Amino acid sequence: MNDLKSIIGKVATGAPLSREEAASAFDSMMSGEATPSQMGALLMALRVRGETVEEITGAVSVMRAKMLRVDAPAGAVDIVGTGGDGSGSVNVSTCAAFIVAGAGIPVAKHGNRALSSRSGAADVLAALGVKIDLKPDQVGRCVQEAGIGFMFAPAHHPAMKNVGPTRVELATRTIFNLLGPLSNPAGVKHQMVGVFSRQWVEPLAQVLKNLGSKAAWVVHGSDGLDEITLTGPTFVAALEHGQIRTFEVTPEQAGLGLCGSDGLKGGDAAANAVALQSVLDGMPSPYRDVALLNAAAALVVAGRAKTLAEGVAIGRDALDSGAAAARLKHLIAVSNS
């Protein structure tokens, strides 16, 4: 084990940490050995200098080692965003998750309450009637029986309680905003991850590659959204067959029209729940289109679709047949049983 004081001293000089040094430091923080001052110093020094791929990889490896695991099928996917994009948008990845599940791909969705918006994944699911504070075996049963399960981050990452107060006091973004979406308790190997800043698209794809993901898209909308956006291009780093390639996608490539940012504005959890249900009930809207677009990308990652356009067609079938809505009803029933 590396001495935490010496690691903080190294970071203070601007020098990057090795993967092992980062893992040692984050193990100290998450096991409760580090003092609040040490945690604050390390987190802010990393933030100011800029976290490296190796540092994030080391930190995620510790998060994963300490999390409470969920059993999920080998081909399960996660659709998750970092949050913190400040958009106050509708719950895109949550809605997309039901479309993907409706298309027959098991979904092990990881999420939390709102970070910067008025409604995070946990908030909107609770408003829809889903029981979110489940034990790992109960979530596993949801994935098996309903085709989709929700892992409420605080319930699966108990070690985070040791860093929570420091994060609240710092009141600014830290490396932990990046770690959560990369630390899926079901250990999924197929991920669609939205990030709050363009600068993190390629690095997080590299982290996922380092940690054994089979296929992933890391995305950031040109309008700042931590999803694939409907207002213009989206930056993508795709991990495929052990290689990372970067490109841009647009709604038009998937056969969808552009919309203004106002079309994606959300409200509180209750309002967003009504909006999500209306999409699952087949109502046309920009929300339906952006959810279809993100579901299409997840279907590409899962190997179910070859192109975004094909993924949108599969997603439309899942919505129009009622299959996606049925997944929500089933999840509500299983999670509360």
UniProtKB/Swiss-Prot annotation:
Gene Ontology terms: biological process: L-tryptophan biosynthetic process
Key words of the record: Amino-acid biosynthesis, Aromatic amino acid biosynthesis, Glycosyltransferase, Magnesium, Metal-binding, Transferase, Tryptophan biosynthesis
EC assignment: 2.4.2.18
InterPro entries documented for this protein: Anthranilate_Pribosyl_Tfrase, Glycosyl_Trfase_fam3, Glycosyl_Trfase_fam3_N_dom, Glycosyl_Trfase_fam3_N_dom_sf, Nuc_phospho_transferase
Molecular function as annotated in GO: anthranilate phosphoribosyltransferase activity; magnesium ion binding
Positions bound to Mg(2+) 1: 93, 227
Residues holding anthranilate 1: 81, 112
Cofactor(s) the record lists: Mg(2+)
Pfam families recorded: Glycos_trans_3N, Glycos_transf_3
Amino acids binding anthranilate 2: 167
Residues annotated as binding Mg(2+) 2: 226-227
Residue pairs linked by disulfide bridges in the UniProt entry: none
Subunit structure: Homodimer.
Family: Belongs to the anthranilate phosphoribosyltransferase family.
HAMAP family membership: TrpD
Name of the protein in its database record: Anthranilate phosphoribosyltransferase
Underlying gene: trpD
